[in-house]
């Protein structure tokens, strides 16, 4: 078995990941959109590349998103570091998706900030199951009795 060059191998990993891998430049324009992003959000790479991140950020949180995004582009620092973040997203068909993601600042050889990469995972089904489980537990426990209340 012959190993491929690292660049080719990295490209194959990005292309075949079931997670969305997205790169956006300093202006928030999508420059990379893999097959995982296509599956999660419903946009093909041809549709998404060249568009802003607004296509996946719900309108209700866009202002806050862009404030943070441009602050990071200006300062070159993200307060989230290696944290796993949770946010709602929006699909092409308008439906909501629950996402967990991490971000990395991407710089060129001279250290100039090029933009941000994000790896996103659809956790909608897991969150729905967790909510259903909590509702079942609450129903089984019944109304909580307060100390000193009549039985």
Predicted regions and their residues:
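Sensory-domain boundary/capping and coupling elements
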Residues: 4-8, 127-145
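PAS-family sensory domains
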Residues: 8-16, 39, 77-78, 112-122, 135, ...
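C-terminal helix caps at helix-to-loop junctions of PAS-family sensory domains
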Residues: 16-17, 147
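Short hydrophobic secondary-structure edge segments in sensory/regulatory modules of signaling proteins
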Residues: 21-22
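PAS/LOV sensory domain surfaces, especially short acidic/polar patches at coil-to-helix junctions
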Residues: 27, 31-39, 51
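PAS/LOV-family and closely related PAS-like sensory domains
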Residues: 36, 45-49, 54-100, 107-109, ...
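Sensory-domain boundary capping and coupling elements
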Residues: 101-103, 120
